[in-house]
Amino acid sequence: MDKLRLLGSYLRKSPLTSTVSEPGIKISPKQFTFSVRVRDKDRPSKISTTKINEPASKLENTSTVVHNEYLNSLQLPYLARTSLRVSKYDYKRAAQFSNTLKRTLKTQDAHERIFSISSEDVAKLISSLFQVSEDNVSLVAKKRFFERECFTEIPKITEEVLSDIQEFEDYIGLLTHTKFHHKGSSLQDGIIPKLLKNLLHPSNLRIAPLKTASVFNDVIYYYGNKNNFATCRELYAQMKSEGIAPNVQTYNLMLRNLLRNSRLIKQQLPYREAIFYLERMKKENISADVITWNTCYFLLKDNISRAIFLEKMVERGVPLTYHLLYGILEEEDIPFNVIIDFLRENDIPVDTKIIKICHRSLIKRDKFQASWKLMEYARHLNFRVKDPFFLEEYLRQFSEKGRMDMCIMTVNTFKATFEVEPTLHCYDLLFKCLVRQGYSSEFSRVYQMLLINLKEHTGGHVVMNYWIAKCRAIMNSNIKTIPTHDSITRLDALAKRCIWDKRGIKWNCWLEYSEYRNVFRRLGSVPYQSNSRDQLDKHEVAKSSKKKVKYLKKLKETAIRNKQSHDAAYRNDYYSALKNDLINRGIIEEQAK
């Protein structure tokens, strides 16, 4: 809350500024040509989990060799991963520094102590920002919008994509911003990262004229979200070596990656690396925008530095934006009443983003009734509450407690009242809830019901995750009879009748919504049997045991073995295997060989 008070003191000098955004362009998979799936007859089936045919390190070595070949083709010897390290990364020293920093932040004089060791770097950081800022620091409008997830094959690489720079930029933007679940395309070892590296390969002469700063920015964004910061730095170096000038978005992404990386175990504070990027901006005559200033603010670790930074922002005329406020509210776990008081004191109007932050604050404190009233209030005032965010927040809390009854009622109510359909993450949470609830005679029927609804959402695909695998393991160990299709259909029809009404969200829905007790029984949501009302309030959650560690290890080993079987061709000839994969999936034409 210290950061919030600090911001409030400067809002009197410089009120919050809104980013005036022009209507952005939505880029959807539907804009591109979809492939016709070709069945690969030679595709190996999943192998048994009882044997390990080859060591897992073999596939990792193949990936390393391919990546080294990529780096060597850049001819940039200063890149860290172009040669073997003389000495290994001192993880022990990094852990010691990070632990010391955490302990220091908990002391009474934390801010004074941290400022004393970093004041020079903070001063240089602010000075560097001044040098790359114009008189009027620009606001940034969002120009492109992408769909959150897609369950079809990735779009086909057509001649239109390969002959037009704008089409190519949109195509790369789609691959890097939309999560494609089909065959795990967007995963770390999926087809998308392989395709991106092949397209951006220095020896790919056909793509060379299509490479722009926007293309590299999108790929840096993609790897930054996967915490692959080394690849981001290599892409930045590749841009410069190929004569593609970075822009302010490039440096904002590198600073954003630095911010994400600083939250991991590190050997030093992130200020010097930030100064390096700012000095590069000065050398290349690139002006900082509001995002640059905001990102640098969140790099700071102590309130003294933050106060100086905000003072200099106001002095330089940098607008204090809502994005800065959102970041502070999300970074600290601030109670709902404190947020409301802050907004009232500083005369800040409420928008949808602030509604979301307040909603999350209430949910974290189990104030479900208040959070529901907040949503009703926002809906009547025409705020955009038709957002899966709110549904996911409820399900995240209910699933942790194993409350399948509350999860199902919440999903149904969001469909009926807010016209919000559950996302893939919502289904992940529902399967988690089923596991947390524990085994009952209805376990298999509820699982099959959720699976049918999931397939309706994904178009027939089952996107595997830990909780689905856990459900299957529980059924293999316990299930005696297989539920019929009719019984599953009846359960689904009954479950969809359960919704929250004017009574609101009640933790004791067994008592408050007694008309649904028969459905709750069928869902396996029978409360702890006791005469004590206090005991009834406490739901017994199925606790994980030591077996969980062994189970996760077995899942990992199974995945590695199946991957080895599928990627055998990549170990023999990586690029030929990649071409065959793209052709078999219809992403490129066969004559493109």
Swiss-Prot record:
Sorted UniProt keywords: Membrane, Mitochondrion, Mitochondrion inner membrane, Repeat
Name of the molecule in the record: ATPase expression protein 3
UniProt cross-references to InterPro entries, sorted A to Z: Pentatricopeptide_rpt (IPR002885), TPR-like_helical_dom_sf (IPR011990)
Gene3D superfamilies xref list: Tetratricopeptide repeat domain
Subcellular location, record wording: Mitochondrion inner membrane
Organism of this sequence: Kluyveromyces lactis (strain ATCC 8585 / CBS 2359 / DSM 70799 / NBRC 1267 / NRRL Y-1140 / WM37) (Yeast)
Taxonomy, superkingdom: Eukaryota
UniProt topology in membrane: Peripheral membrane protein
